[in-house]
């Protein structure tokens, strides 16, 4: 091949090299483009396949409430953007919907602020691209008692909401103090100073952590603010570490470890940043008999993270006080149960 004929090839190669090695915009895009050799990832249904924030590789877009960075963008087809908070915090954000973004639910488009009943069990509202639902059925709790040692909810013919029934014990040797029903997390009601004649203060329960192990996100919606405007709030959460083998800590003869003891204080990690303080945190354990262990009482505290470049960011985080192990586990086929939606404060029971 002659030098003249190689001219276009050489130019194309130089252009391609420049595109692949260009520094991308943002803190996490300073290196050259390096994409995995395997084919583009297969995204779950409803999740867009987009170029990362550096314009290099195809990735599954982050969804509402998930953590995002320059390289991990939010789903643009759902009107989401990465909200980084203050200008100084430009590393990690949370995917947030633009004001007034509509919702797509069950193949139907709902306007922001529009309410609808998804089923006989749930009343839902679209808010800036997110659907929040309140249960229409009673969420009361019945714990084991001498006259009803094995309570459980059952679906009765002709009725929408499940009702409590008492089963006779199948095996008398299995009776123990374990809780048989999921109990609502303790939450704080509206600030008395925010109750005004022209504002009905409403706050949803914190949703369950988005991950069963490792760092996740928990969200809620409230209008408990000076402008009485609905806003989404988020906090970090960790139900249990992923690397811990908690089943090894279950005592002989037992089937659960409700709140395993942590041998030493730990530091939390978030996208390469480490908490500035150590924490003797509590985590929820596991069971070997099909029960779930979930947070029962929690509190929210600020945690400061320091990044390798010296930047410090502050994030609210859930801290567990107590856990409960129960059979009322969220169903994989029930989108609302899996998110632990609860009724809003101020609603009629």
Swiss-Prot record:
Disulfide bonds join 29-54, 33-56, 35-57, 43-60, 68-82, 74-95, 256-293, 273-307, 284-323, 287-325, 292-329. Changing residue 22 to P: In SEMDLSL; likely pathogenic; decreased CCN2 protein secretion. It is found in: Secreted, Extracellular space, Extracellular matrix; Secreted. Residues 1-26 form the signal peptide. It is linked to Kyphomelic dysplasia: An autosomal recessive skeletal dysplasia characterized by bowing of the limbs primarily affecting the femora, along with short stature, short and wide iliac wings, horizontal acetabular roof, platyspondyly, metaphyseal flaring and distinctive facial features that include prominent forehead, micrognathia, microstomia, cleft palate and low set ears. Spondyloepimetaphyseal dysplasia, Li-Shao-Li type: A form of spondyloepimetaphyseal dysplasia, a clinically and genetically heterogeneous group of skeletal disorders marked by vertebral, epiphyseal, and metaphyseal abnormalities. SEMDLSL is an autosomal dominant form characterized by childhood onset of defective skeletal development. Affected individuals exhibit disproportionate short stature, short lower limbs, limited joint flexion, premature osteoarthritis-like changes in weight-bearing joints, and low bone mass. This is CCN family member 2. The keyword Cell membrane does not apply. Residues 247-349 are annotated as: Heparin-binding. Keywords: Cell adhesion, Disease variant, Disulfide bond, DNA synthesis, Dwarfism, Extracellular matrix, Glycoprotein, Heparin-binding, Secreted, Signal. Residues 27-98 form the IGFBP N-terminal domain. Glycans are attached at residues 28, 225. It comes from Homo sapiens. Residues 256-330 form the CTCK domain. Belongs to the CCN family. Pfam families: Cys_knot, IGFBP, TSP1_CCN, VWC. Major connective tissue mitoattractant secreted by vascular endothelial cells. Promotes proliferation and differentiation of chondrocytes. Is involved in the stimulation of osteoblast differentiation and has a critical role in osteogenesis. Mediates heparin- and divalent cation-dependent cell adhesion in many cell types including fibroblasts, myofibroblasts, endothelial and epithelial cells. Enhances fibroblast growth factor-induced DNA synthesis. GO terms for biological process: angiogenesis; cartilage condensation; cell adhesion; cell migration; cell-matrix adhesion; chondrocyte differentiation; chondrocyte proliferation; DNA biosynthetic process. GO terms for cellular component: extracellular matrix; extracellular region; extracellular space; Golgi apparatus; intracellular membrane-bounded organelle; plasma membrane.
